[in-house]
Amino acid sequence: MAVVCSKADWFVTSCSTTLVAVNLKQSREPFVFDCSKAEKKPKEADVDNKSAGEGSEEKDSDSILAFAISASGKHVALTDDHKRLVLFCTEPSWKCISTRWVVRRCTSLAFTQAEDELYVADKSGDVYSFSILEPHKAGELKLGHLSMLLDVALSPDDKYIITADRDEKIRVSFRRSPYNIQAFCLGHTEFVSSLLVPAGHPDWLLSGSGDGTVNVWHYETGRRLHSVDMRKFGLDSENTEKRFAVSRIISSPDGQHVAVQCEGFPSVQLFTVDCGTEGLLKPADTLTLPLSPWDVTFDSENQLWVLLESEDMKVLLYRHSEQHWRLCDSESPELKKVTNALQTQWHLFKGSVGLESQFKHLYKVNFDNMASYLQKKQERLDLEHKKRAAAANGSKPNKKSKTESGAVPQSTS
């Protein structure tokens, strides 16, 4: 699948093995990085990773699994299926600073606000920190969950590290001493797929889940402030039993708008943040799209970008005007710049259309054994009834009387 993210002046997207970065304000050439041509893993590192428990049956495809942009836009990091962790600087020009190796395949990356560390969450439930100031230093294990981690976030003051896992849990830990847990945010009934500390609200946490809800938390205390069921917005009116996950939650830089994307539905739901009411998200617009989006992001100008899952390249740009979100003209300079940059790599995006859901295997498996139980119960009752009937029939005299049996035998004495 394709992923997009915008920070500072940069619009960055990844698909398959390739990352493409476009500067929205400066006339700079787009930056393209192909992981299949990147530095290969040393043999000794490969042996160490296999001995650490990574299955050799999983083939390395060089596909990008996650990437992150620092708050200033000066650093970008990506991790791929080959277990690389590649760090870039973007100023004065793009440059690969280092290539390091992670123990297991990663699911999420997050920079500190100070941009001195990068936190990496992996599928085994561990979080490692990697230094930005010492770009070749090995990572340090910071904390672990008992199940796969799906997202990691940091508080704006870098005090807390927030982790979400497959087993419905959100954990808030002290970054400097992660063994000290500040709080748990508990309430989802399926895996937690997305985390966001929204701009302008540093004490809030927004979380999305495979249960189809978005929750708003005061994460330092673990208190839930608000919950939104995305089914209420007509996402699944035809099949109310269908399961779906909240795949992305983003907020505009001015902190006034929140956008929620649910996997597999051709729409994006917009909310406004009601600062007068604690933790309240007020429904605003529902953007009905021609196709399901791969991903969405806000840029530094509070514009909403939507990348559609299509064999024909379709990038949409929306602006908030007169209390509504309106589609921008295709001749918009920023949109043309992004479209032209992605056009050269679109063969990679076309190959990702229709791929299997990344959340499909994360849902809890429910067994409906009531019918089997009732059938077995009825079989036991029938068997017991037959036994009782047989016992009742066997207790009655079944022998013929002497008078009916003929002459009485004579004594021989």
UniProtKB/Swiss-Prot annotation:
Instruction: Relate the assembly described in the record.
Output: Non-catalytic component of the METTL1-WDR4 complex, composed of mettl1 and wdr4.
Q: What pathway does the UniProt record associate with this protein?
A: tRNA modification; N(7)-methylguanine-tRNA biosynthesis
Q: What is the lineage of its organism?
A: Eukaryota, Metazoa, Chordata, Craniata, Vertebrata
Where would I find the WD repeats? 101-140, 144-183, 187-227, 286-328
> Which Pfam families does the annotation name?
WD40 (PF00400)
One term under GO cellular component:
nucleus
Locate the region Disordered: 386-413
Task: Tell me what this protein is called.
Answer: tRNA (guanine-N(7)-)-methyltransferase non-catalytic subunit wdr4
What is its biological role? Non-catalytic component of the METTL1-WDR4 methyltransferase complex required for the formation of N(7)-methylguanine in a subset of RNA species, such as tRNAs, mRNAs and microRNAs (miRNAs). In the METTL1-WDR4 methyltransferase complex, wdr4 acts as a scaffold for tRNA-binding. Required for the formation of N(7)-methylguanine at position 46 (m7G46) in a large subset of tRNAs that contain the 5'-RAGGU-3' motif within the variable loop. M7G46 interacts with C13-G22 in the D-loop to stabilize tRNA tertiary structure and protect tRNAs from decay.
Biological process (GO) annotations?
A: tRNA (guanine-N7)-methylation; tRNA modification
